């Protein structure tokens, strides 16, 4: 009952006070738009913030796609209240930081060459082309500062139907960045999505590519997955559970998860405790996993 009330409150708040009407955000978009005619859109929100806005979820990070390059962005905000940080110049990304916001701005781009881990990119001003290089349709929904949706990959419909799917050919998307295998699992669990056999086959046939990904990126993605409120949904999908265990064979004690699921609503179990539950046994399983993924000492103390 409480969850329904909370969701209703968020929905009312979204309709009456949408996040994009915030004065600071409007200033950012007005600044980016300066020098361009009204028929050219200089910037749009994209990714998680748009997805969460449409689902009435709490927005905890904001990504902005723009036709401006990083030098142009820095020039426009050099005398503003925002501090500009070079967080990913090589990939066209800077971060604007103020007292209230941390905004990641990335120039529209397309991949020229990929190796399964990193991509060489070319900067563009074509919104549809930019959408085609993204991972999932639900992450390629754009929103302008006036609340108008641009949805070239039909992500809104997929989001409504809890359908997490790759843009275009699953094999191609995965081979651009093998971390997308784990990301697909995370989003599919989060939205309780049933994926088609073509996608499942693509995940399985490309598992070896995960070896190309840094251990830190893999572990960070795992912790995001374990922090999901509905991580237990993985128990409903044998295909996803089996793929998860192929990637993380040390997290093998799923029988414990099945028992926990029965009382989960009465417990508050964080991702570190959950990691421990799936790992710890009478062997050196935990120690091996910690070594394998270079787990920092502060996290080791929590497990």
Q: Where do the protein language model's features map onto the residues?
A:
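Catalytic cores of the polymerase beta-like nucleotidyltransferase superfamily
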Residues: 1-303
């Amino acid at each position: 009952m409480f969850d329904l009330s909370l969701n209703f409150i968020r929905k009312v708040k979204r309709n009456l006070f949408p996040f994009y009407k915030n004065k600071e955000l409007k200033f950012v978009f007005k600044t980016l738009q300066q020098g361009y005619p009204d028929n050219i859109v200089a910037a749009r929100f994209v990714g998680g913030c748009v997805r969460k806005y449409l689902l009435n979820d709490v927005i905890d990070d904001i990504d902005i796609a723009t036709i401006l390059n990083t030098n142009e962005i820095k020039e426009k905000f050099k005398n503003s209240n925002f501090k500009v940080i070079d967080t990913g110049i090589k990939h066209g990304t800077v971060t604007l930081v103020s007292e209230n916001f941390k905004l990641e701005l990335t120039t529209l781009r397309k991949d020229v060459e990929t190796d399964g881990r990193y991509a060489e990119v070319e900067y563009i001003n074509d919104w549809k082309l930019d959408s085609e290089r993204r991972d999932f349709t639900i992450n390629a929904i754009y929103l302008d500062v006036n609340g108008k949706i641009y949805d070239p990959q039909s992500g809104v419909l997929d989001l409504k139907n809890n359908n997490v799917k790759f843009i275009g050919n699953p094999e191609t998307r995965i081979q651009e960045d093998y971390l997308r295998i784990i990301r697909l699992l995370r989003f599919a669990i989060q939205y309780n999505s049933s994926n088609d056999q073509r996608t499942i086959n693509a995940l399985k046939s490309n598992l070896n590519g995960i070896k190309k990904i840094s251990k830190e990126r893999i572990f960070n993605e795992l912790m995001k997955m374990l922090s999901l409120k509905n991580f237990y949904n993985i128990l409903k999908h044998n295909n996803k559970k089996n793929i998860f265990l192929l990637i993380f064979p040390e997290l093998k004690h799923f029988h414990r998860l099945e028992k926990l699921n029965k009382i989960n609503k009465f417990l508050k179990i964080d991702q570190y405790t959950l990691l421990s539950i799936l790992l710890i046994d009478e062997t050196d399983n935990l120690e091996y996993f910690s070594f394998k993924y270079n787990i920092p000492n502060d996290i080791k103390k929590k497990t």
